[in-house]
């Protein structure tokens, strides 16, 4: 299928303190085989030189707009960008991402399906440069299977603007706003399809500390959004069983404690198995990788409980989210 110049798309990107990554993203936008009709970058109050850098990169190029929105979370920034978009079809991606040169082309091509879809999700993969990033992918990135996308991501999608209008846009949250938006889209009976070939690449957190901070924040906002059933309760049930094993080990027989390493290894093996189409079974036989998978898993568990506790203690945040 050749590029359809008559198919006009508005590409919306929220940005905040992205001076280290924004140049690469804009470069991959310029290399798209299917060019968007307009690119709207909504800055959410960057305190570094992101805005000035964008102005230098873009210059007087046609089609680019920078909106300085003041302090704006990702959801609010997307709302502002979408509200200001001039065209029927809206594409979303995020800063810190590298787009495959045919990403938008494949999304656009999918609109030619019959019946015409209202919402198209593309694919994504993490950028893997070292063992930590590979193990992190195994732990918390959804697996990539042949012929399908990893999971639905708001940072790789194309849809009709009317869908955004019908669901009322995004809640103005720091995290989980994308999940709420996507759920509202599905609840409306929107015709949603996927396109595995539309690939973008995103950066993982580079170490345990930043990984903990990320999941601590996500955990807190997911609790405020009332989404514990999708994440927290499952983890809590596992640890309740582990506490039972510990008590039995203390009160009955130390043999019960042997179930602790078995539980940890089983979780690691399950994750390795789910990613076998990407990495094969090699991480299972690499003791360093296997141990690192367990450590990252426990780090995320700790962040889950930490964020959960913070959400329960910070009632103002709960009330703010519940009123959105």
Each model region followed by its residue ranges:
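Short, acidic, metal-binding catalytic loop of nucleotide-sugar glycosyltransferases
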Residues: 27-36
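Glycine-rich, basic loop-to-helix element that forms the pyrophosphate-binding segment
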Residues: 68-85
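Membrane-embedded multi-pass helical conduit in multi-pass membrane proteins
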Residues: 240-315
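Conserved donor NDP-sugar-binding/catalytic core segment of glycosyltransferases
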Residues: 102-133, 203
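A recurrent flexible, glycine/aromatic-enriched loop bordering the glycosyltransferase active site
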Residues: 126-127, 141-159, 174, 200-203, ...
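Catalytic donor/gating beta->alpha subdomain of glycosyltransferases that bind UDP-sugars
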Residues: 171-230
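Short aromatic/hydrophobic "clamp" motif used to bind/position activated sugar donors
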Residues: 90
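A conserved acidic beta->alpha catalytic loop
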Residues: 43-52, 94-97
